[in-house]
Amino acid sequence: ELADLKRICDNRALVLIEDNCESFGASHQNKYCATWGTAGTFSFFFSHHLQTMEGGMIVTDDQDLYDYMRSLRAHGWVRDIGDNSSLYTKSGDPFEDSFRFVLPGYCVRPLEMSGAVGQVQLSKANDMLDQRIVNSKIYHHFFDNVDYARTQLPTQNSVHSYFGFSFVLENNLYNRRKEVIHLLKEYDIECRPIVAGNFMRNPVIDR
């Protein structure tokens, strides 16, 4: 589907931005998820594949977008962008440019502590991703023998990174989700919706 989405966006001059917060390490057709579009987002919250306690990252190969995001990340100033950026052409005097603000920016730079934790996590990332795949095979082996749940399988030429293990209730468990959630909680098994659903139905859209 990523290839189809990319083709649709290219044909209609649309910008493809991938929410990849739960798919770190996943790939399709030997191309990492989050690299198919103009930009891709990742979350490094503590429950995700790679943890830095909080925060995340955005990846892009668009230099203009990169400069805009670097500026927005740090107060809207220009000290972190290139000398000849389309966003702003620097004067060449670092003293003058150090506090030149061109965007209504934020202060969302990662802390050094988060960076240190992230570097340690990154060194173990491949092993952790491999273990998630091993775990998924155990779960798939069990669910292959039941008729009350349909599991999510990788599509052809894809690698699944298993943020969690998702399934859809069917047959005698159809429409009994609350009962299943209650039972899982009794055994201290954490569960959540597969995704957030239609975001356009959230109250924030009305504001």
Question: Where do the PLM segments sit?
Answer:
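Active-site PLP attachment segment
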Residues: 35-80, 112
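Generic detector of well-ordered alpha-helical packing
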Residues: 19-23, 55, 113
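Conserved PLP phosphate-binding loop immediately N-terminal to the Schiff-base lysine helix
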Residues: 1-5, 12-36, 40-43, 49
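PLP-dependent aminotransferase class I/II
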Residues: 2-4, 11, 27, 63-207
